[in-house]
Regions:
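Transmembrane beta-strands of outer-membrane beta-barrel pores
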Residues: 1-2, 48-54, 75, 87-93, ...
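Repeated loop/turn-to-beta-strand initiation elements of outer-membrane beta-barrel proteins
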Residues: 1-5, 41-44, 76-83, 135-143
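Residues on the lipid-exposed face of transmembrane beta-strands in outer-membrane beta-barrel proteins
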Residues: 32-36, 69-73, 129-133, 165-169
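Extracellular loop and loop/strand-boundary signature of outer-membrane beta-barrel proteins
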Residues: 15-20, 54-58, 101-103, 107-108, ...
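C-terminal hydrophobic structural anchor segments
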Residues: 73-135
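Residues that define the transmembrane beta-barrel architecture of outer-membrane proteins
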Residues: 26-30, 60-67, 123-127, 157-163
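Predominantly the C-terminal beta-signal and adjacent terminal strand-loop region
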Residues: 132-165, 170
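Membrane-embedded translocation segments of transport machinery
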Residues: 1-37, 41, 52-54
Length: 171
């Protein structure tokens, strides 16, 4: 058996990754990104992505988007270090024609108009801060924190805070 589609590589909401509840899906994605070094010590940028998903069995379509803006401060606190901030919205379904199907009765397999469409009501915002500290030419340590607002595109879900530490070895 074939697994469910994962259009967003496991980032963003479950509906964005699988907008048609496991049905065969095609996906076309457009994106743009920019990064501008304002000075030796300040870099700004961002990206925007927009995707068009189509249910391969029906004429149903879904639209998925994501975006972010970032600020980087190279050499902050020392050569090779980096202080960074990011704010954006993880992939989410903006609009979706799909409705769950009837599973019994004379309408089996048809869309049920009484059930909600698979779309994300609230934007899943993410705020991120990190500091890459260069120990030497080959090793850096990057502590950071992520704050997730409206996880899974639902404002009823509690805000999540996640601390991370990454060590990078470059040889």
């Amino acid at each position: 058996a074939q697994g469910a589609p994962n259009l967003t590589g496991s980032t963003g909401t479950a509906y964005a990754a699988n907008p048609f509840n496991g049905e065969a899906t095609s996906f076309n994605n457009l994106g743009a990104q920019v990064q501008w070094r304002l000075s030796r010590r300040i870099t700004v940028g961002g990206w925007y992505g927009y995707g068009f998903a189509a249910n391969r069995r029906t004429s149903e379509e879904a639209r998925i988007s994501n975006w972010a803006a970032f600020l980087g401060l190279p050499d902050f606190g020392g050569k090779g270090n980096l202080l960074g901030f990011l704010f954006g919205a993880a992939p989410r379904v903006l609009d979706n024609d799909y409705r769950p199907r009837f599973t019994t009765g004379r309408l089996i397999g048809q869309a049920n108009p009484n059930l909600r469409r698979r779309l994300d009501e609230d934007p899943p915002f993410q705020l991120e801060a990190f500091y890459r500290y260069r120990l030497n030419d080959n090793i850096s340590i990057t502590p950071g924190v992520f704050v997730l607002f409206n996880p899974e595109g639902n404002s009823a879900n509690s805000t999540q805070v996640v601390g991370v530490v990454r060590t990078t070895f470059s040889f």
